[in-house]
Amino acid sequence: MSTENTLSVADLARENVRNLVPYQSARRLGGNGDVWLNANEFPTAVEFQLTQQTLNRYPECQPKAVIENYAQYAGVKPEQVLVSRGADEGIELVIRAFCEPGKDAILYCPPTYGMYSVSAETIGVERRTVPALENWQLDLQGISDNLDGTKVVFVCSPNNPTGQLINPQDLRTLLELTRGKAIVVADEAYIEFCPQATLTGWLVEYPHLVILRTLSKAFALAGLRCGFTLANEEVINLLLKVIAPYPLSTPVADIAAQALCPQGINAMRDRVAQTVQERQYLVNALQQTACVEHVFDSETNYILARFTASSSVFKSLWDQGIILRDQNKQPSLSGCLRITVGTRQENQRVIDALRAEPV
């Protein structure tokens, strides 16, 4: 047998996958901490009891109780809801449904969430960036100049990692600019911390608007991997063509339905109030800490701050078992670290450690 033309496994892989730098999730970055403030999770676990034991049967593709409960919570019709393995799968589904690899592009506005880029690159879709303005609002002219060939525009509001809301008038202008040209995806992963800012009421006006949601943040279920896509029925039907046949396991659907019952939603709102209170405590303390240059406003469960020596601060806290998220390499975020709001005890440990840093 000739071996002249044999290829290695790496050679057999698609070129874009060989060159791909995977998303550096908080867990992938690792660390041996006991204070985990790097992934925007809720700091304590919520207990659930499984009520569905029929694990010998395949689950529903779109579990009825989960869809109906979420639709009622979000104020939309069940036909406007799709549930998936986290909002990350929703990102991928939209790109797969609307973008032709090698032809179409997505557009996003850094500094922002990294999975828009990674998902597009994995699928083989061009990525275009229009950096946010100095105040981290949208550069509408820059976006307008890049719409030819762009099929999907991703906007995160509140934005991760900066924490601020996108100006609603700018969002409306964006939706008008893209009408008949591109899908606009509003990532509302953190909307429970500022529910008044949701765009769900705009779905009736904009057939090309898609909204991403998750149970990972305010619902304290990051380990469940359950997210939602809200859109008009025509969009949902297209996404249903490309989603896996059984995206949610029976236990995940069981717990999600419980979390979305009235009692679960009330508990979520209590957690939000607790988080907002702790966020203010942390902001006040950071503003009185010598190694902190600036604390940015936040509408979320995390705070972005600029430090006089962020790399050494990050490593020093890491060595003490306090794991933060380094944002230094993001555009316009030099010297910045992101701190998830933890328990009072965790927040105090962060402040004590920061105040012990040499200035």
Curated annotation (Swiss-Prot):
Its cofactor is pyridoxal 5'-phosphate. It is an enzyme of class 2 (transferase). The modification N6-(pyridoxal phosphate)lysine is found at residue 217. Its EC number is 2.6.1.9. It catalyses: L-histidinol phosphate + 2-oxoglutarate = 3-(imidazol-4-yl)-2-oxopropyl phosphate + L-glutamate. Coiled coil: none annotated. GO terms for molecular function: histidinol-phosphate transaminase activity; pyridoxal phosphate binding. PANTHER family: HISTIDINOL-PHOSPHATE AMINOTRANSFERASE (PTHR42885:SF2), HISTIDINOL-PHOSPHATE AMINOTRANSFERASE-RELATED (PTHR42885). Homodimer. This is Histidinol-phosphate aminotransferase. The lineage of its organism: Bacteria, Pseudomonadati, Pseudomonadota, Gammaproteobacteria, Enterobacterales. The gene is hisC.
